[in-house]
């Protein structure tokens, strides 16, 4: 029984590492000037789909400045954009991917708000759709954006 419990814990932990992509900030551009505190800014981040080698996504997000920023207390606005592209051969079979899976998640407030990106498979059109949404536990946000990646042959 104990070994079954440990196996379940290992499976859950390894599943989390397979699902969640890590984003790297490329650059941030200030959008306001605050004399005595950090500026509001828009940051561009990049991540690769962990289950679809050959796809890279860039997401831009507004980030709130002020004194709450260094402490992580600010709630970032639900303003974002996403662009995903095929940058290499895509050899994974679309039928092996789930119809809809979360591939990226980033907290945008200390408590209840998160930006999530889902991969949605459109098998009839051989396309992968990436849907970015902002969530809140109490009132969900209608903010969303999509990017599509048609699977194209890649020259070798």
Where are these regions (language model features)?
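Positively charged n-region of N-terminal signal peptides that target proteins for export
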Residues: 1-4
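Bacterial N-terminal signal peptides
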Residues: 7-16
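Short, intrinsically disordered, charge-biased short linear motifs at domain edges
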Residues: 16, 40-46, 69-73
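Sec/Tat signal peptide C-region and signal peptidase I cleavage site
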Residues: 18-23
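Extracellular/luminal recognition modules and glycoprotein regions
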Residues: 26-47
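Mature extracytoplasmic domains of secretory-pathway proteins
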Residues: 54-121
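C-terminal partner/receptor-binding element of secreted or periplasmic proteins
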Residues: 124-156
């Amino acid at each position: 029984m104990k070994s079954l419990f440990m196996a379940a814990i290992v499976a859950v932990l390894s599943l989390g590492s397979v699902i969640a992509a890590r984003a790297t900030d490329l650059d941030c551009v200030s959008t306001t000037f605050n004399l005595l505190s950090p500026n509001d800014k828009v940051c561009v981040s990049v991540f690769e789909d962990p289950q679809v080698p050959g796809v890279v996504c860039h997401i831009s997000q507004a980030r709130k400045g002020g004194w709450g920023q260094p402490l992580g207390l600010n709630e970032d606005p639900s303003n974002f954009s996403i662009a995903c592209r095929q940058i290499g051969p895509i050899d994974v079979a679309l039928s092996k991917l789930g119809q809809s899976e979360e591939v990226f998640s980033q907290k945008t407030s200390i408590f209840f708000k998160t930006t999530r990106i889902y991969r949605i498979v459109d098998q009839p059109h051989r396309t992968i759709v990436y849907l970015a949404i902002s969530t809140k536990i109490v009132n969900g946000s209608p903010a969303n954006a999509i990017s599509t990646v048609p699977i194209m042959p890649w020259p070798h």
